[in-house]
Amino acid sequence: MVTVEEVRKAQRAEGPATILAIGTATPPNYVDQSTYPDFYFRVTNSEHKKELKAKFQRMCDNSQIKKRYMHLTEEILKENPNICAYMAPSLDARQDMVVVEIPKLGKEAATRAIKEWGQPKSKITHLVFCTTSGVDMPGADYQLTKLLGLRPSVKRLMMYQQGCFAGGTVLRLAKDLAENNKGARVLVVCSEITAVTFRGPSDTHLDSLVGQALFGDGAAAVIIGSDPMPEVEKPLFEIVSAAQTILPDSDGAIDGHLREVGLTFHLLKDVPGLISKNIEKSLVEAFRPLDISDWNSIFWIAHPGGPAILDQVEKKLALKPEKLRATRNVLSDYGNMSSACVLFIMDEMRKNSAEEGLMTTGEGLEWGVLFGFGPGLTVETVVLHGVST
C-alpha cells in the first residue's frame, strides 16, 4: 500500500522554481511624455484650465518618463466622451474595451515567451493571469487559454484588482506551483491597460492627475518550472524565496475603487516615505538566511511606482546609482505598467547582462531582489539567484 507521504514525495520537484523565458508586448500606439499634457488637456476639453495644465506639465516633466504606450487613441476617446470626463458613467465602454484587449495583449507577450522557451505549448500545465484592468467571467485566463490554444485541462488562476505589487505576487504563486508539482510548467501573464483609469483632470483631486502622468500599457509573460531539462531549457533566474507584508501605518496610502466611472485611483503624498522607511526590514528578513547585508552587493528589480519612490529608496539605502539602472530605464521607456513592470525590468536586466558580457543574468551578481509595491500598502519581496550566462 502506498502512503500519502510517498505520493507527496513523488509529486514534488527536486530543485527551485526557475524562470525559463520572458516575453513582453505593448500596444502599437505611444505618447511622448513632453507633449502629453497638450494632448491630454485637448482630448478632455480642459484647455481652459491653464493653471492645472501647468501643474500637469510639471508632473510629466518630473516623471523621468520619456514615452508611454497606450491602447487609447484620440479616435477612441472621441467616440467615448464620458471616458474623457473626470467622473462620468463610463464603466460599460471601458469594460467592452478591456475584456477584449487585455487577453489580446497578454497573448502577444505569452507567444514571445513560449517562442523563447522553445517547447510545445502543450507542455504548459498551469496558467496564472493577472490584471488590474476590468473584471469578467469567464476571465482573461479563459480567454487567453482559447487564444493560445492551450490544453483545456490547463490549471488556471485568475487574479483581478491586485495593483502594482502583483508582479511579485505572481512569482510567489508560480514558485509554489512549480516546486510542488513535478514537471509543472507555469505560464504567468500580467497584462495592463489604462483604459480603466483614464479620466479628465480635476482641480480638487490632484492624486488622480498623478496617475494620468505615470500609467502606461503593457503585458509581460514568463514561463516558470523546476528542474530545467539540460540542453533543452535555458534557466534565466532562480526564485529562492518570496514574502508579502502590509506596511505599518499605511492604511489608505494607495487605493483603487471600481465604480460606474471606471477605476478611481487615490494616492497619499507620503507613499515614497512609507516605502523607503520600511523597505530595509523586508530586505533584512529576506537576506538574513544568505548572510547578506550589503544592499549594493545584490542586483535590484523594483517596481517603479514613480520617480520619488525610487529616489527615496536609493537615498535611504545608500544605493549606488547603477543599482536601479534597469528599473529607471523601464520607467523612462514605458511608464508605470502596474503588475507588468517588474517582469519588463527582469527582461531588460538579463538582456543588458548578456550584451555587456557579464558573468550572470543579474548584472554579473549572484543574488538579487525583486520588489512589488502597491495598494495596502503591500510589499512583495522576492529573492532571485542570477544564472551564469
Swiss-Prot record:
Disulfide bonds: none annotated. GO terms for molecular function: naringenin-chalcone synthase activity. It comes from the Eukaryota. GO terms for biological process: flavonoid biosynthetic process; polyketide biosynthetic process. Signal peptide: none annotated. CDD domains: CHS_like. Gene3D superfamilies: 3.40.47.10. The active site is at C164. Its EC number is 2.3.1.74. Transmembrane segments: none annotated. Keywords: Acyltransferase, Flavonoid biosynthesis, Transferase. SUPFAM superfamilies: Thiolase-like (SSF53901). It catalyses: (E)-4-coumaroyl-CoA + 3 malonyl-CoA + 3 H(+) = 2',4,4',6'-tetrahydroxychalcone + 3 CO2 + 4 CoA. Pathway: Secondary metabolite biosynthesis; flavonoid biosynthesis. It is an enzyme of class 2 (transferase). The primary product of this enzyme is 4,2',4',6'-tetrahydroxychalcone (also termed naringenin-chalcone or chalcone) which can under specific conditions spontaneously isomerize into naringenin. Belongs to the thiolase-like superfamily. Chalcone/stilbene synthases family. This is Chalcone synthase. It comes from Hydrangea macrophylla (Bigleaf hydrangea). The lineage of its organism: Eukaryota, Viridiplantae, Streptophyta, Embryophyta, Tracheophyta.
